[in-house]
Swiss-Prot record:
GO terms for cellular component: extracellular region; plasma membrane. It comes from Vaccinia virus (strain Copenhagen) (VACV). GO terms for biological process: integrin-mediated signaling pathway; positive regulation of cell migration; regulation of inflammatory response; semaphorin-plexin signaling pathway. Interacts with host VESPR. Keywords: Secreted, Signal. PANTHER family: SEMAPHORIN, SEMAPHORIN-7A. One of its GO terms (molecular function) is chemorepellent activity. Belongs to the semaphorin family. Pfam families: Sema (PF01403). The keyword Nucleus does not apply. This is Semaphorin-like protein A39. Residues 15-403 form the Sema domain.
Amino acid sequence: MIPLLFILFYFANGIEWHKFETSEEIISTYLLDDVLYTGVNGAVYTFSNNKLNKTGLTNNNYITTSIKVEDADKDTLVCGTNNGNPKCWKIDGSDDPKHRGRGYAPYQNSKVTIISYNECVLSDINISKEGIKRWRRFDGPCGYDLYTADNVIPKDGLRGAFVDKDGTYDKVYILFTDTIGSKRIVKIPYIAQMCLNDEGGPSSLSSHRWSTFLKVELECDIDGRSYRQIIHSRTIKTDNDTILYVFFDSPYSKSALCTYSMNTIKQSFSTSKLEGYTKQLPSPAPGICLPAGKVVSHTTFEVIEKYNVLDDIIKPLSNQPIFEGPSGVKWFDIKEKENEHREYRIYFIKENSIYSFDTKSKQTRSSQVDARLFSVMVTSKPLFIADIGIGVGMPQMKKILKM
């Protein structure tokens, strides 16, 4: 078994390997300002300008989070489990007394979703050891700490989170797959919205609850196949819209990538009826962002607590996936092609296979490497991150196929 850090891979020019100093298990990867941060147990590696650096931290400390908090110091933080006592450090390894570890890293090694926007930090990380999975706003100047209600967020967490403008207000959007039923399991993919500067509920018991949480189902169907398990998501901003890319898995031995217009999604949140609600909507309507200092009425909060699902289904652009791929896809990223506005190359990985889909030619190419792939991050060139090499000697790229 060969310890690896990642692969610099080009379909045209082959492969280049960069190795860990010691055998490591990759815990997390983040790309911040074109710097790759790779969290392992007890350390974080950074890679930029073809240079690899390691910062050692405490032992028994799974680094799950690398995040740039946009406060006055504009520090990049790395946060980990720290032997069951979550903690954050600056990238040079020094202590960071300004940011508590809870909410930035879990108590035990697990997959996390965390974002920072205008100094506000949000995550699906439990702040107590036995806590229920929730989506929280827990640090920064956006207002009180807020969290979702019980069982709104699935136990395995989110598959994407981002902030986007809706008129003059910032809204945070999250993606997840809900599982319904006990005898016949049904999976429903959702995108949910909340106002970033939500003031919380109107009573002392609800003041730390999101008061603008609404969700709507996403559709990704073709030829009778319905893709419903969200793997991963990305957004691309255009001149007048934000395009949401969502990779789905399915029971059909296939996966699919669907794209959605955020303008369409925002319109649905603004105008759609609430599923199961038949009365006239209160004022302000559920999900509407209010000016600073304004709190929703008791009536509005009661409605959104009981009826937070839209009576609508968001269809993808062109009413079908961009393409279908193999099942078991783990991660993907997107790169705009040089000198070709709004044409992209989409990279995705499965086990030890690498794929590239060209949105212009509609061709998919694939290759295999002697390594277990962890994730893919696109900078000026795609970085394919692997945590284990298989066999003896440096792993090789096996083949390139057109599909």
